[in-house]
Amino acid sequence: MTPRRRRLGLLLAALICVGIATTLVLNAFRSNLVFFFSPSQVAAHEAPVARSFRLGGLVAPGSIRREGDGMTIRFIVTDTARQVLVVYRGLLPDLFREGKGVVARGKLEADGTFVASEVLAKHDENYMPPEAADALKQAEQVNRRMAGTPQGARQ
């Protein structure tokens, strides 16, 4: 084998190794990423079914229901435009309240119910995850347009 062919073979082997390593790294990232979706995005079928993601919004007033076992809680998360039913089995954070911000991590069932494995409540009256704040602003703009209220007008 000539030196030129040997260099070409080594270069080809190195490129194959880099390609395999890149594929493995990207696959690992894809399986560990947890995306954020608002109730409006879930209603628009933008959220994956049976794959973990975060759902954020406000706990709808009057929506918290405890099951007979005392550990299963059902509540509705809203972004003021759409609502998603959430089912969670476990202890809720102390700051979990109706009308307050919440981020739930879990999976969407085929029937549209979000089964949460973790529920996080906002930690003070001013904090809201940026994604949830953006989703609420977008939903508010949609509500204004649907109601015919000018965007700059106050209600």
Swiss-Prot record:
Stretches that traverse the bilayer: 8-28
| HAMAP family with a match to the protein in the record | CcmE (MF_01959)
Q: Which UniProt keywords apply?
A: Cell inner membrane, Cell membrane, Cytochrome c-type biogenesis, Heme, Iron, Membrane, Metal-binding, Plasmid, Signal-anchor, Transmembrane, Transmembrane helix
Q: What is its main location?
A: membrane
Q: Does the keyword Cell membrane apply?
A: yes
- An annotated GO BP: cytochrome complex assembly
Q: Which domain of life is it from?
A: Bacteria
- Role according to the record: Heme chaperone required for the biogenesis of c-type cytochromes. Transiently binds heme delivered by CcmC and transfers the heme to apo-cytochromes in a process facilitated by CcmF and CcmH.
* GO CC aspect terms: plasma membrane
* The UniProt record lists the keyword Metal-binding: yes
List the subcellular locations. Answer: Cell inner membrane
Q: Which organism is it from?
A: Cupriavidus necator (strain ATCC 17699 / DSM 428 / KCTC 22496 / NCIMB 10442 / H16 / Stanier 337)
| Gene3D superfamilies with a match to the protein in the record | Nucleic acid-binding proteins (2.40.50.140)
| Classification lineage | Bacteria, Pseudomonadati, Pseudomonadota, Betaproteobacteria, Burkholderiales
One Gene Ontology molecular-function label:
metal ion binding
What are the coiled-coil residue ranges?
Answer: none
Positions that bind heme:
123, 127
Cytoplasmic compartment ranges equal 1-7
Membrane-side (Periplasmic) residue stretches: 29-155
Membrane topology designation: Single-pass type II membrane protein
Name this polypeptide is given: Cytochrome c-type biogenesis protein CcmE
Q: Which family does it belong to?
A: Belongs to the CcmE/CycJ family.
Q: Which gene encodes it?
A: ccmE
